[in-house]
Amino acid sequence: MKLIMNWVLAATLLCGAGVFTACSSDDDNSDKTNNISEKIIGKWMVDELDGQKCPTNYKAVITFLSATKAYGSLSDINSDSWNNHASADVVIDGNKVTLTAYENEHIKHVTVTEINTITDKDMTLKSDWKAYLDGKEMINEVYDNERYIRISDDYENDIIGTWEGKVTSSEDEHTDGELHRWEYKANGTYVYYSKENDEWKASNDVMADYFVDGILLCTRWKKTIDSNELREWWEIESIKDGVMKWKALRMREDGTTYTATFEMTKVQ
């Protein structure tokens, strides 16, 4: 599976792989892609890349606010990029959707996409993503046979508060089966607590950030200024009656996958 390299792929992913080709004149295909500027409005999350289920730590969310504006969120697994509701300009022409975003004054990302089908539940697509440094192309990636699913839940506000819980699956790379506690704040930071002598002690990490976009929860933290930055990715399955459930599709080193689960209770 090709690796996602930047948030703009959140925009870019919106259309799968493959170099853009002209729209089909087939009437049936046309029926599946008409009124894209209306159907595309809303929040979408990548579900499959190149025909394979997408691990959670590769997932991106993109929200189309209108036919001309969007924003995307991605905690990039391959770089230091951290994009929380990053904005992008959109141009829609038939089933061709182009997204343009500026990472800074020097780096521009352009994604040309072709939507094959779009419904109220999902869309299948292709994409051709290019990144430019001072006008010079430095990266070009194409994706084929991608699928995005529409996201109706948004837990950005519901997660705020203090939660205690542990992993509920037999396997997960991030947790040890012990109880853990997190306090998620409205400003996009959090406090992690560990238990010492039956008392919860707040950590003093120099960085502890998180974002929720739809159901995607991403965190990053550093213990000290000189330590490596660590990241974690989950999908919020539900928040109801003071109970929050997470799940994540993880990939082992041998390429096989498993589903990790986590459950916690709100304590304040």
Question: Where are the regions a protein language model picked out?
Answer:
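Ser/Thr- and Asn-enriched, surface-exposed coil loops between beta-strands
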Residues: T68, D93-N95, T117-M123, D213-I215, ...
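Bacterial Sec-dependent N-terminal signal peptides
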Residues: L3, G16-G42, D144-Y155, T261-M264, ...
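An anionic, turn-rich surface loop/hairpin at beta-sheet edges
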Residues: T98-I115, L216-E235
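Tryptophan-anchored aromatic micro-motifs
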Residues: I36-P55, Y148, S152-T175, A208
